[in-house]
């Protein structure tokens, strides 16, 4: 019999329901988690056997949105969901980040979490309930897990923090912050803001963490009633004799290697030491486990680096704890791009380009919460050569998508509106060197490249990555961390913003016990570092260029009467197609009569504008127009006096004298001047040649007429 076990509770303005025991009973745990009408079904499956040679914790999180959740059928030929969208990948990462640090350090069993959106209210984003559902499922599974965690979205509207605001409210919010943590510790923060102060961001983090305690308590209550027996895990004992031998013989060598400032030289030296250790002990005992030697080696590396930092010695590359690496800033280095910059910070380097396009280049996004158009694209590429390695080159991986999204969010607060700058903007960051915080280098490079492209951003944006080493009550904050400091430290805290405040933030903790005071200090240290970087950037380029690149399309905007749109488009698009081909421009028309003409050549755009104005001009009775004969019939001739406007010159209106045959007086494609006699109720034009003054009808006048 199916035996549902349910917890239902109020969470801010929403009702949360967690149900287990009915669906997917062969998984280690399964939870149907819902926030009002948005429901996510989360399963957890773990392997009790560790794969041979496993060196890292193989946790996989899959987040998938089913279109039936919104009552829709997928598009495309196959009419079914395909590869994960960018939003699905980003949400999977959001679920993963607060959960990963809560597994035991030596736990190497494969775990898969699958979160499937099965019902969605467009006003309630599924990401928060997905984290809650995953936390609940892990807590029920019996898998070793130091949870549960809660999650909350915090908005900031009218100087007040709002818990889990609905989508409509988020449009008026100056903050979109997601925070997740355990009862006592904050583990993950992801935020985008409209230039808020450090104090307001910290207040939002604390508010969100306090509010989510009700979630944690209810998951614990559910776990007490429905959790499975905990796994019995035996971790292999470390060979203490081997560890002591390696420490006594090689710790000093490893310590000396970590005073080599150059990353590649340091890696080469460390690899050489490791190879010597493995060779030495294999010669003594051919059956020795080399993986164990590597584990001991990594443990010594971590101990050496952390001990040096905590004892206030210089860091790996010789810097003090709050020192920023040497900066080199260059703009306009790619001659044919619309904007470019090269931002170098120590051994981390980003080559950024900006391309301007029309609204046709915008990305149409078919998302579960509704369709939307994105006019600002940010793509981050991390090729293997950036870290001196050989690797696969292809479609972007999850990490690249996540870093690109963070960099994009860092810039959104300063981007111009479409009304002020009607371009689609694509930014591409090529990471050409990497040794820590390449995403924040991308933010700095993108800010410079946008200004180089003439994009009128409100102010420059810079980013910095902060680190932390904590042992007991002692802790040291590090500014502008290296890759090794990220790997061997306890926190990765990325902060981006302007001189006035923060635009984006991403924080990932690897340990519990990070206090609010430490977060506050990290925010303040990040502000000082950000101001230093902005000062260097402003020396290279302190405002957007007044003109866009000569190679970028110029967009000219005119307004026409909406009733005239059909005249510009023509039957089956014939007129606008002809205009586009003949003028060499791109013409876009909106329903309100806004016409955008884009071209890299100013004269071509002017020509297109002139011809559109001719088409949309109001025909006045009694006015004389230049026209072209388009058809000759027995009873007269049809004359075009502008694209889409054709009138009849009756045979009686050709001349004062009797006209026996129209073709004796007029020829096809002949340019003539005509006078508008009448516009009937159906908009048809009655034209005349004979009514025009004889001076205008001179051959010279006719031959010089242009339409």
From Swiss-Prot:
Cofactor list: Mg(2+)
As recorded in UniProt, its EC number(s) are 2.7.7.8
**SMART domains linked:** KH (SM00322), S1 (SM00316)
Which domain of life does the UniProt lineage start with? Bacteria
| UniProt KW keywords | Cytoplasm, Magnesium, Metal-binding, Nucleotidyltransferase, RNA-binding, Transferase
GO CC annotation, single: cytosol
InterPro entries from the UniProt entry: ExoRNase_PH_dom1 (IPR001247), ExoRNase_PH_dom2 (IPR015847), ExoRNase_PH_dom2_sf (IPR036345), KH_dom (IPR004087), KH_dom_type_1 (IPR004088), KH_dom_type_1_sf (IPR036612), NA-bd_OB-fold (IPR012340), PNPase (IPR012162)
Chief location of this protein within or outside the cell: cytoplasm
Q: Which residues form the KH domain?
A: 553-612
Q: Which reaction does it catalyse?
A: RNA(n+1) + phosphate = RNA(n) + a ribonucleoside 5'-diphosphate
Which positions in this protein are listed as binding Mg(2+)? 486, 492
GO: which molecular function terms? 3'-5'-RNA exonuclease activity; magnesium ion binding; polyribonucleotide nucleotidyltransferase activity; RNA binding
Annotated membrane-spanning segments are: none
Segments forming domain S1 motif: 622-690
Entry's localization field: Cytoplasm
List GO BP terms, alphabetically. Answer: mRNA catabolic process; RNA processing
**SUPFAM superfamilies recorded:** Eukaryotic type KH-domain (KH-domain type I), Nucleic acid-binding proteins, Polynucleotide phosphorylase/guanosine pentaphosphate synthase (PNPase/GPSI), domain 3, Ribonuclease PH domain 2-like, Ribosomal protein S5 domain 2-like
- Give the record's family classification: Belongs to the polyribonucleotide nucleotidyltransferase family.
Q: What does the UniProt record say this protein does? A: Involved in mRNA degradation. Catalyzes the phosphorolysis of single-stranded polyribonucleotides processively in the 3'- to 5'-direction.
Q: How does it assemble?
A: Component of the RNA degradosome, which is a multiprotein complex involved in RNA processing and mRNA degradation.
What name appears for this protein in its UniProt entry?
Answer: Polyribonucleotide nucleotidyltransferase
Tell me the organism: Buchnera aphidicola subsp. Acyrthosiphon pisum (strain APS)
- What gene, per UniProt, encodes this protein? pnp
């Amino acid at each position: 019999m199916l035996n549902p076990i349910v917890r239902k509770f109020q969470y801010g303005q929403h009702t949360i329901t967690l149900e287990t025991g009915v669906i997917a009973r062969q998984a280690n745990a399964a939870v149907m988690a819902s926030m009002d009408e948005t429901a996510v079904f989360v399963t957890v499956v773990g392997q009790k056997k560790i794969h041979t040679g496993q060196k890292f914790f193989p946790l996989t999180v899959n987040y998938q949105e089913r279109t039936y959740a919104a009552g829709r059928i997928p598009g495309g030929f196959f009419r079914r969901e395909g590869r994960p969208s960018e939003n699905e990948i980003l949400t999977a990462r959001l679920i993963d980040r607060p959960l990963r640090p809560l597994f035991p350090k030596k736990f190497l069993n494969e775990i898969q979490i699958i979160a499937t959106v099965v019902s969605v209210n467009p006003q309630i984003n599924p990401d928060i309930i997905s984290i809650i559902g995953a936390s609940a499922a892990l807590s029920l599974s019996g898998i070793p897990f130091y949870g549960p965690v809660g999650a909350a979205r915090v908005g900031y509207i009218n100087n007040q923090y709002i818990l889990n605001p609905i989508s409509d409210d988020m449009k008026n919010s100056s903050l979109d912050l997601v925070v997740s943590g355990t009862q006592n510790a904050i583990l993950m923060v992801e935020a985008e803001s409209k230039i808020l102060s450090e104090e307001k961001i910290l207040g939002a983090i604390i508010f969100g963490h306090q509010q989510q305690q009700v979630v944690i308590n209810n998951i614990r209550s559910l776990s007490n009633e429905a959790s499975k027996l905990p796994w019995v895990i035996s971790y292999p004992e470390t060979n203490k004799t081997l560890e002591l031998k390696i420490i006594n013989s090689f710790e000093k060598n490893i310590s000396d290697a970590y005073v080599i400032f150059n990353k590649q030289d340091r890696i080469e030296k460390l690899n050489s030491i490791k190879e010597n250790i493995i060779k030495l002990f294999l010669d003594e005992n051919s059956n020795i486990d080399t993986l164990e030697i590597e584990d001991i080696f990594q443990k010594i590396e971590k101990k050496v680096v952390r001990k040096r930092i905590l004892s206030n010695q210089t860091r790996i590359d010789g810097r003090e704890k709050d020192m920023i690496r040497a900066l080199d800033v260059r703009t306009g280095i790619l001659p044919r791009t619309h904007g470019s910059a090269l931002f170098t910070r120590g051994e981390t380097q980003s080559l950024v380009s900006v391309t301007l396009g029309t609204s046709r280049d915008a990305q149409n996004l078919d998302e579960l919460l509704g369709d939307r158009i994105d006019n600002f694209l940010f793509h981050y590429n991390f090729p293997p050569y950036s870290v001196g390695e050989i690797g696969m080159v292809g479609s972007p991986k999850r990490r690249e998508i996540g870093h690109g999204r963070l960099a994009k969010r860092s810039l959104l607060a300063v981007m111009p509106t479409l009304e002020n700058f009607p371009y689609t903007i694509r930014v591409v960051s090529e990471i050409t060197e990497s040794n820590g915080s390449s995403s924040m280098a991308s933010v700095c490079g993108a800010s410079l490249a946008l200004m180089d492209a003439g994009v009128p951003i409100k102010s420059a944006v810079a980013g910095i990555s902060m680190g932390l080493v904590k042992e007991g009550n002692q802790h040291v904050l590090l500014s502008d961390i290296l890759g090794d400091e990220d790997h061997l430290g306890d926190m990765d805290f990325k902060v981006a913003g302007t001189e006035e405040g923060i635009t984006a933030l991403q924080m990932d903790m690897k340990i519990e016990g990070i206090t609010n005071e430490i977060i506050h200090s990290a925010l303040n240290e990040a502000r000082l570092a950000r101001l230093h970087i902005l000062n260097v950037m402003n020396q290279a380029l302190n405002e957007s260029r007044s003109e866009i690149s000569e190679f970028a399309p110029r967009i000219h905007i005119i307004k026409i009467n909406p009733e005239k749109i059909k005249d510009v488009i023509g039957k089956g698009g014939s007129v606008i197609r002809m205009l586009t081909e003949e003028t060499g421009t791109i013409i876009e028309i909106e329903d309100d009569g806004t016409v955008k003409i884009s071209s890299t050549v100013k004269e071509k755009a002017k020509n297109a504008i002139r011809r559109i104005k001719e088409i949309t001009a109001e025909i006045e009775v009694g006015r004389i127009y230049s026209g072209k004969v388009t058809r000759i019939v027995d009873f007269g001739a049809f004359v075009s006096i502008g694209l889409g406007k054709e009138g009849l010159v009756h045979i009686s209106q050709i001349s004062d004298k009797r006209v026996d045959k129209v073709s004796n007086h007029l020829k096809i494609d002949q340019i003539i001047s005509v006078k508008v006699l009448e516009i009937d109720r159906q908009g048809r034009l009655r034209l005349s040649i004979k009514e025009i003054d004889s001076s205008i009808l001179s051959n010279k006048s006719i031959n010089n007429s242009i339409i």
